[in-house]
Amino acid sequence: MKNVMFIGYGSMARKVHEMLPKNIILSTVLVSTRSAEIIKTELGESIAVITSVDDLIETPDLAVEMSGQDGLKEHAIKILGKSIPLGIISVGAFTDEKFAISLADTAEANGVEIHILAGAVAGIDGIHAASFAGLSDVVYQGKKHPSSWKGSHADRLIDYDNLVEPTVFFTGTAREAAALFPDNSNVAATIAIAGVGLDDTTVELIADPTLEYNIHHIMAKGVFGKLEISMAGLPLVENPKTSSLAAFSALRLCCQIDQVIQM
């Protein structure tokens, strides 16, 4: 048996919890003060619900962040300081260079690993492998239904009422995209970190009222040749802003801690 801790308990964490195999136990949930009592009632007494890393009673084999950038920045350093390996969904937080350096330094000092989760896309392993030989161009296009962009910085850029065809509303670097759209563009930061970096990865964000699926399209060129990946992914039913595959990538990491053969 292995124990895991979740940072955050929103729609993604609930989906991962629901799908955990019997040999992986959710022992602790770290949440905000305002939601703690509600989540305690929901989970019962078998799972510890805490609001600070200082309240941790049992040290888990792995912590997985599914809280968003604010939760990650609040708790990650203390978690790594307790020598707990950490999986991260909110990769957009790496646009904060000071925070990213602090994460790496703390993990190294305490002999633990930080796992950057692939999230909503495939091909991250190929892009990272190609980066060792040299990549010249990496372009990511994120296409989603307008409803998936609502409530984000896109509200200032999109005329939702008059949107009738696919519209590119943002073009910039992965650093800019992940900072402006933290809930929607963590995947852009993941691709960038795996490849040519946050400042040299081009990102296009598109609102398309005809879509039923979220479309993630990656194009890369380098010494290895050319790579092109297009994925049509369903969002979680509980949260249209969250990719179901992102939840499954977190589930995969949880399952790996009890597997001898690693993929």
Swiss-Prot record:
InterPro entries: Asp/hSer_DH_NAD-bd, Asp_DH, Asp_DH_prok, L-Asp_DH, NAD(P)-bd_dom_sf. This is L-aspartate dehydrogenase. Pathway: Cofactor biosynthesis; NAD(+) biosynthesis; iminoaspartate from L-aspartate (dehydrogenase route): step 1/1. GO terms for biological process: NAD biosynthetic process. The lineage of its organism: Bacteria, Pseudomonadati, Pseudomonadota, Gammaproteobacteria, Moraxellales. Belongs to the L-aspartate dehydrogenase family. Its EC number is 1.4.1.21. NAD(+) binds at residues 120, 186.
